[in-house]
């Protein structure tokens, strides 16, 4: 595994570097959307030590959200794994927090096959409504607009 090869088997170090790199990307600017905010958990959860509730995971993720809010960016809600595992990125548990922080979101499937482009889309909209979102962002005629859910 690459965790063993590149991070000496230390999942916590991998998580730290992932979020450090995400923060650097946000700071560098030139973007509207932060995607794959916590997609690291897709593979990270294969390790027994991996725990979303632990400070070593939660705090750097929340620091990224703080920076997203500060910079006025939006977060991608990625539905790629909804059909297989009923998972979104960021995790469903974080949607309410993003709503509380008034961080706008856009829904994307990140699919590589045209017939899967809408997989999980309706479910993501439903979960966003449950989390208190009233709209998502969509690119309309070259401009980001809030579209009611």
Feature names for model-found ranges:
Residues 47-149:
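Charged catalytic cores and adjacent phosphate/nucleic-acid-binding surfaces used
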Residues 1-71:
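Extended substrate/RNA-proximal surfaces in nucleic-acid metabolism proteins
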